[in-house]
Amino acid sequence: MMRIRTDLDFFFVTKRPERFHISLPEDWGEGYKNVHICCTSENQYMADKRLPVFLELPIRHKSIIHGPMLGPINIERYLEKYGKEIDQVVCGGESGDEARLCDYAWVMDTMCQCVKYEVPFHFKQTGANFKRGDQIYHIPRKDRQIQAAKAKIFAEAKPA
């Protein structure tokens, strides 16, 4: 289907990059132009476990998602080595009744890492519980993406 429908973009999110090679089509090569694959890493442990595997895979369009972002995550070593191969990094807080905290400082730190290596960055949503400075905000579901957009925390790639 993905090979046939080149008029569509396919977007997949995984937390199991080690299973990527299972069921790949024979003509995958370096990936199809219309397939985007994202790997999640919610904390430093998972980033260090998943990203070395994910970033070595033959995928044309790769993105990293810190979602839900549950702590500070340093991905500089991955951005330094693979930055030109990463389409973007996305961060967002956790949703749900028992959502864990997302801290503005963690989001800003990740954005700064991306800026340093010229990798696009997008802050998708605050999550249900968002900390900025000493204040913790409990944000209704309908406002989580709106509040993230109002924060204007993003970085675009420099033109080639």
Predicted regions and their residues:
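Conserved AdoMet/S-adenosylmethionine-binding subsite of the radical SAM
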Residues: M1-H122
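C-terminal accessory extensions appended to soluble enzyme cores
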Residues: A128-A160
